[in-house]
């Protein structure tokens, strides 16, 4: 569930307020809230010429679901133009006993070894949206954005700590559609993604897909609540690391 706060806008800029849905006349919109993703985290890391195991941080290391915060900012200089800024910090940690032999960063972790595992996944999204169709009861727009993703996984035992880190700027294209069945309720669906096929670059490859559908109930022009479903998937390889999140 997300709490939505939006600043007011001058009526002559967007048209008569009576023609617009509640909460649609704004210059700046700030959303802050929580979401509870189902963890699906697989990472492999090689070192010293030794291939790494595909480690499932859920089944192998006991990572469990938890809630995370999210911040979204929308800057709207014109009726059909939106600049988008999103930040999603994700961090999991767990303590477990290895149930099968794992190899990570060239180090073997045998059955029975106690491991403290941590994985962080931070994503920034900077984008621009242009609404090619904009009506009083909804709009349809195209999105171009750049995502900056940083993933770090670490295993800590009595013998030492090993970690793998992958950073990548990822361009993405997408689309968004919103409809207002009534003036106080907006229903939105958006998707962005990018795919770099294998063979284009021998060091990097993979895909990133972000799908979001949600409803926004606006109590006033400045306050509303939002609830919905989001799927955020990334898979790829970065030199000696591969990830599937």
What are these regions (language model features)?
Residues 80-83, 136-138, 183-187, 219-225:
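Repeated loop/turn-to-beta-strand initiation elements of outer-membrane beta-barrel proteins
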Residues 11-90:
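Short glycine/proline- and aromatic-enriched beta-strand/turn motifs that initiate or cap beta-hairpins
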Residues 6-8:
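N-terminal signal peptide c-region/cleavage motif recognized by signal peptidases
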Residues 38-66, 89-122, 148-168, 196-204, ...:
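Extracellular/periplasm-exposed beta-strand and loop segments of Gram-negative cell-envelope proteins
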Residues 25-27, 66-70, 121-125, 168-172, ...:
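Transmembrane beta-barrel architecture of outer-membrane proteins
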Residues 139-141, 148-151, 159-197:
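Detector for outer-membrane/organellar transmembrane beta-barrel domains
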Residues 30-32, 71-75, 85, 126-130, ...:
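Residues on the lipid-exposed face of transmembrane beta-strands in outer-membrane beta-barrel proteins
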Residues 30-36, 85-89, 142-148, 189-193, ...:
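Transmembrane beta-barrel strands of outer-membrane/channel proteins
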């Amino acid at each position: 569930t997300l709490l939505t706060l939006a600043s007011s806008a001058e009526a002559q800029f967007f048209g008569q307020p009576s023609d617009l849905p509640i909460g649609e006349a704004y210059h700046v919109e700030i959303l802050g809230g929580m979401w509870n993703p189902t963890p699906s985290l697989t990472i492999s890391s090689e070192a010293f010429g030794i291939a790494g195991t595909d480690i499932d941080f859920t089944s192998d290391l006991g990572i469990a679901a938890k809630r995370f915060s999210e911040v979204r900012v929308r800057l709207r200089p014109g009726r059909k133009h939106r600049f988008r800024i999103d930040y999603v910090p994700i961090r999991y940690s767990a303590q477990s006993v290895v149930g099968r032999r794992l190899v990570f960063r060239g180090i073997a972790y045998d059955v029975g070894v106690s491991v403290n595992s941590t994985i962080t996944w931070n994503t920034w999204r900077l984008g621009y949206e242009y609404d090619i169709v904009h009506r009083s009861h909804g709009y349809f727009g195209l999105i171009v954005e750049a995502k900056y993703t940083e993933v770090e996984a670490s295993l800590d035992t009595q013998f030492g700590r090993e970690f793998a880190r992958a950073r990548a700027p990822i361009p993405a294209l997408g689309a968004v559609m919103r409809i207002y069945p009534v003036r106080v309720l907006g229903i939105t669906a958006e998707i962005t993604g990018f795919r770099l096929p294998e063979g284009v670059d021998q060091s990097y490859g993979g895909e990133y897909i972000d799908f979001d559908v949600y409803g926004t109930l606006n109590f006033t022009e400045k306050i509303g609540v939002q609830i919905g479903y989001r799927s955020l998937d990334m898979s790829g390889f970065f030199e000696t690391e591969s990830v599937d999140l």
